[in-house]
Amino acid sequence: MATLPLPTQTSTISLPKPYLSNSFSFPLRNATLSTTTNRRNFLTTGRIIARAYKVVVEHDGKTTELEVEPDETILSKALDSGLDVPYDCNLGVCMTCPAKLVTGTVDQSGGMLSDDVVERGYTLLCASYPTSDCHIKMIPEEELLSLQLATAND
């Protein structure tokens, strides 16, 4: 079996005609293409293997390390792991699950935070998909609400 690293953006893979009849394109976050070939080195199967990111969450004086898949939110993994983190709408709207991104990056394009607030490193766990290993610190809801309202009035 061969494993090929792929870029972290939409990729197109083209293989010569003996291997595959056409090319295909798909979005990737943190993945490799794993293929199996037969005795004549013809491609017989292919699958995408995504690597989970290490996300460290600080909450209630404790630090917890999570392995979060690229297609799951940090909130869903935190809840599955037994962390008692606040949340409500699970849609990135109510601002009940705020956090400060200490290191790393997340895709939170589905959340409703203003660009100014996002640029300052704030995130909503329910709308955050890791795009790298991260360190996140839970913050009081009031801290994010006051910042979001202040930037809305600018």
UniProtKB/Swiss-Prot annotation:
Positions bound to [2Fe-2S] cluster: 89, 94, 97, 126
Cofactor note: Binds 1 [2Fe-2S] cluster.
PROSITE patterns reported for this sequence: 2FE2S_FER_2
Keywords per UniProt: 2Fe-2S, Chloroplast, Electron transport, Iron, Iron-sulfur, Metal-binding, Plastid, Transit peptide, Transport
Gene3D superfamilies in the cross-refs: 3.10.20.30
One BP term from GO: response to high light intensity
Transit peptide: 1-56
Any single Pfam family the record assigns to this protein: Fer2
Compartments reported by the entry: Plastid, Chloroplast
Induction: Induced by high light at protein level, but not at transcript level. Strongly up-regulated in response to acceptor limitation at photosystem I (PSI) in plants lacking of photosynthetic [2Fe-2S] ferredoxin (Fd).
Domain 2Fe-2S ferredoxin-type: from-to ranges: 57-142
GO molecular function: 2 iron, 2 sulfur cluster binding; electron transfer activity; metal ion binding
Cellular compartments per GO CC: chloroplast
Cofactor(s) essential for the protein: [2Fe-2S] cluster
PANTHER family: FERREDOXIN, FERREDOXIN C 1, CHLOROPLASTIC
Family the entry assigns: Belongs to the 2Fe2S plant-type ferredoxin family.
Role this protein plays: Ferredoxins are iron-sulfur proteins that transfer electrons in a wide variety of metabolic reactions. Mediates alternative electron partitioning in conditions of acceptor limitation at photosystem I. Accepts electrons from photosystem I (PSI) and is capable of electron transfer with FNR, but cannot support photoreduction of NADP(+).
Name of the featured protein: Ferredoxin C 1, chloroplastic
Source organism (scientific name): Arabidopsis thaliana (Mouse-ear cress)
Gene of this entry: FDC1
